[in-house]
From Swiss-Prot:
The lineage of its organism: Eukaryota, Metazoa, Ecdysozoa, Arthropoda, Chelicerata. The keyword Amino-acid biosynthesis does not apply. This is Delta-hexatoxin-Mg1b. Residues 1-26 form the signal peptide. It is found in: Secreted. The keyword Disulfide bond applies. The presence of a 'disulfide through disulfide knot' structurally defines this protein as a knottin. One of its GO terms (molecular function) is toxin activity. Pfam families: Atracotoxin. Inhibits tetrodotoxin-sensitive sodium channels (Nav). Intracranial injection into mice causes strong convulsions and death. Intrathorax injection into crickets causes paralysis prolonged for 2 minutes, followed by recovery. It comes from the Eukaryota. Expressed by the venom gland. InterPro entries: Delta-hexatoxin.
Amino acid sequence: MKILEKALLENDSAAEEESRNLRTKRCARKRAWCEKTENCCCPMKCIYAWYNGQSSCDHTISTIWTSCPK
């Protein structure tokens, strides 16, 4: 019985990790990084999410500078 439980747990954790990697990549709304526009903040939120393994970041560093109002 314990062998069966262990096998089921291993299968569940592998499926969970796979589904987490396949989920839609988007900007995380984890923190408000600046007091300007969402376009300015969104790349930083993506970078935060990418750093924490929650998402990939489709924006480049240059996007941060070009999308922020002066």
